[in-house]
């Protein structure tokens, strides 16, 4: 049996009109290898369903996590994931109900620091006479993606008192 768990965004929030990182954890509990496809379905702003497919290969007993990036249309509050075997039989189906920020005047700020509490003052800060507020999302070296699309949910990333040597070359 192959199992799939999925999570999205940073801190369980998503912003429409941007690329959304989706982290998918696979576990192959079968005694044989698994070869198939992960299919991700999203509803785009033009109300058309878009389909993204990614190959999946798992050795017997293997567990692994992959990150995918899909564009998130406006007014889309869910994403469907299906794991298909090599014969295109559906093995697992998941629905991700997205927590879309309903506040259009919110600036998402990623905070990369060895002392994240030192940047708390940036959370819920008001700009332009309070018409624009910030939402601070603490980041760690492990959560910085290797693909720049993984940071598309942020309006800015603030770095303070951080050891750059903890990042990989790809990051």
How should these model regions be labeled?
Residues 11-13, 27-32:
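Short solvent-exposed strand-capping/beta-turn motif centered on an Asx-Ser/Thr pair
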Residues 21-29, 69:
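Short edge beta-strand/loop segments characteristic of extracellular beta-sandwich folds
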Residues 46-54, 65, 90-94:
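Surface-exposed loop/edge segments in extracytoplasmic proteins
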Residues 54-62, 66-76, 80:
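Short, hydrophobic beta-strand segments
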Residues 76-156, 160-163:
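Aromatic-Pro/Gly-enriched surface loop or interdomain linker
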Residues 166-171:
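A short, gly/pro- and small-residue-rich
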């Amino acid at each position: 049996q192959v199992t799939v768990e999925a999570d999205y965004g940073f801190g369980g929030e998503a912003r429409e009109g941007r690329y959304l990182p989706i982290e998918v954890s696979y576990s192959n509990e079968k005694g044989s290898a698994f070869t198939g496809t992960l299919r991700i379905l999203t509803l785009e702003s033009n109300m058309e369903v878009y389909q993204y497919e990614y190959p999946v290969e798992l050795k017997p007993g293997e567990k692994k996590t992959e990150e995918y990036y899909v564009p998130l249309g406006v007014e889309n509050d869910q994403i469907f994931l299906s794991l298909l075997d090599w014969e295109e039989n559906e093995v697992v189906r998941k629905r991700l109900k997205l927590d879309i920020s309903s506040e259009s005047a919110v600036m998402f700020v990623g905070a990369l620091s060895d002392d994240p509490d030192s940047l708390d003052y940036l959370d819920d800060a008001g700009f332009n006479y309070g018409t624009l507020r910030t939402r601070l999302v603490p980041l760690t070296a492990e959560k910085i993606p290797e693909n720049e699309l993984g940071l598309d949910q942020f309006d800015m990333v603030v770095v303070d008192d951080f050891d750059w040597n903890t990042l990989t070359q790809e990051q």
